[in-house]
């Protein structure tokens, strides 16, 4: 039983003394690993940032095409009176003087082109 304890103690002492690394070596190794990790993280961050900027540019481009200012404002439908000088007929319609059945009305109406 004593030989087992002595053997175990001897192996333990050898493992501790031979396996113990220098603290400075450990620190240097950890610093190198963290620097490599930081450079990888910086690269990944820059790549992600570029992709996000591309997506944002596409979204802003689509928004500018479909913004409220570029939409057609309220318009007058077919068969509705309109102003001859400032026609607000919807697209595909023209402000014209009525023919035949609408002659007695003295205003213009929106008709299909």
Swiss-Prot record:
Do you know which InterPro entries this protein is assigned to?
Toxin_22 (IPR012627)
* Tissues expressing the protein: Expressed by the venom gland.
Localization per Swiss-Prot or TrEMBL = Secreted
**First-listed, main subcellular location of the protein, grouped into a coarse class:** secreted
Q: Per UniProt, which keywords does this protein have?
A: Disulfide bond, Ion channel impairing toxin, Knottin, Secreted, Signal, Toxin
One example of the protein's molecular function in GO is: toxin activity
Query: Which Gene Ontology cellular component terms are annotated?
Result: extracellular region
Pfam families (UniProt xref): Toxin_22
Q: Which residues form the signal peptide?
A: 1-21
From the UniProt record, list the residues forming the propeptide: 22-74
Question: Which Cys-Cys disulphide bridges does the record give?
Answer: 75-90, 82-95, 89-110
Work out whether the entry's keyword set contains Transmembrane. Answer: no
Q: Function, please?
A: Probable ion channel inhibitor.
Record text about domains:
The presence of a 'disulfide through disulfide knot' structurally defines this protein as a knottin.
Family, according to the entry, reads as follows: Belongs to the neurotoxin 14 (magi-1) family. 01 (HNTX-16) subfamily.
Q: What is this protein called?
A: U11-theraphotoxin-Hhn1u
Organism annotation: Cyriopagopus hainanus (Chinese bird spider)
Its lineage reads: Eukaryota, Metazoa, Ecdysozoa, Arthropoda, Chelicerata
């Amino acid at each position: 039983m004593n030989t087992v304890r002595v053997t175990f103690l001897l192996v333990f002492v050898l493992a501790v003394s031979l396996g113990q690394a220098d603290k400075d070596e450990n620190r240097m190794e950890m610093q190198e690993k963290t620097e490599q990790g930081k450079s990888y993280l910086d690269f990944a961050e820059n790549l992600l940032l570029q992709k996000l900027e591309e997506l944002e540019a596409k979204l802003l481009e689509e928004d500018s095409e479909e913004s409220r200012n570029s939409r057609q404002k309220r318009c007058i439908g077919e068969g509705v009176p309109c102003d001859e000088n400032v026609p607000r007929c919807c697209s595909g319609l023209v402000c014209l003087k009525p023919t035949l059945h609408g002659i007695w009305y003295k205003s213009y109406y929106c008709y299909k082109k």
